[in-house]
Amino acid sequence: MDSQVVEKAKELLRRYPQFSFPLDIEELVTEVGCELIEWKFLSPVKEVKHGRWIGIAEGLERNEQRYLAAHALGHHLLHCGNQLWFRDWHETNVLKQEREADEFAAHLLVPESELEKLGKPTTWEIAEYFGIPEEIAASRLGQFATEQERERWDLLDEI
């Protein structure tokens, strides 16, 4: 878990307190100054971030579209200015940015304050409640969980 990435998601939610959950990611993308468009991308492309435009492939399930929009917004806010690719730029830098965008999306769509209200929900309950893919819900409960969340869940297990 990257605390700077989590903080960036929290900061964005504090800046726009009018949003409730499940988060209207399309409206938030617009508020931030980006434009979300559906596009007929060729497989396997599902999402493209270019400047202020976020393109999402047509025909995807709603929960996947929501996640991809949040993921692309993460790239926009976390990696702005890092769009140049160098010949010797190591693949781990790309993987790091992708992981950060995933973590940002997970915490933006499923913030700690909202997750706490559910007690210790299952992956399916999180996916259903927040309108996200189950894989992202599983990551949010696993690799992207904060230390405070893990401690709280451990206490709930003891009860």
Language model: regions and residue ranges:
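Active-site hotspot residues in diverse enzymes, especially metal/ion-binding acidic/histidine motifs
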Residues: 1-159
